[in-house]
Regions:
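Bacterial N-terminal signal peptides
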Residues: 7-16
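Long luminal/extracellular ectodomains of secretory-pathway precursor proteins
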Residues: 20-179
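Positively charged n-region of N-terminal signal peptides that target proteins for export
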Residues: 1-4
Length: 179
């Protein structure tokens, strides 16, 4: 009789564990994905009239924060140079231009979660993104006869089913939000 009771108890625990595992799997499987959408613009003043125009054909990357460490190092390098009170402005500008060019070359080589390109209206979209973590969004484009465009934003932790909308500006410095 004690063996029968022990056997039935063991089977009951095993059945309960299987039921819990099935319930947990069902709950985990139903977490809706998040999405990140945005629009990239540039503010311009032409003949004393301020306008906003979309930034077309900007390559936009979505990264997990841990994969952007080399980019963050380039941001920090430029920020440290700008923070020096007795720094030579020309030398600081040159150092930041080099870091910007390196960032432009680096970003496409980093492992991205997703990529997109802005359309004619400057919009982009990342769908079916895993929630529960923050992301880094970095947009790059070769500059016409000048420095490349590098736009950076850090998202908050995405919630399940969240649809995050971003308004990005080419006018923001690439060293802006330190990642």
């Amino acid at each position: 009789m004690p063996k029968l009771f022990a056997c039935l108890s063991w089977l009951g625990m095993l059945g309960g564990a299987a039921l819990f595992a099935g319930q947990a799997k069902r709950l985990v499987g139903e977490v809706p994905p998040a999405s990140v959408r945005g629009r990239v613009i540039v503010f311009e003043t032409i003949n004393r009239k301020a306008t906003t125009n979309p930034v077309r054909d900007l390559q936009v990357y979505l990264f997990k924060p841990e994969t952007t460490k080399p980019f963050v190092e380039l941001q920090s390098k430029c920020r440290r140079a700008m923070a020096q009170p007795k720094a030579d402005p020309v030398q600081t500008y040159h150092l930041c231009e080099i870091a910007l060019a390196e960032a432009f070359e680096l970003v496409p080589t980093l492992p991205a979660v997703a990529t997109a390109k802005t359309g004619a209206d400057g919009s982009f979209s990342f769908e079916n993104i895993a929630p529960g973590r923050p992301y880094h969004v970095i947009g790059i484009k070769a500059g016409k006869g000048g420095s490349p465009i590098v736009i950076v934003v850090k998202t908050a932790r995405l919630r399940p089913g969240q649809q995050l909308s971003l308004e990005l500006s080419e006018n923001e410095p690439w060293t802006g939000p330190i990642m």
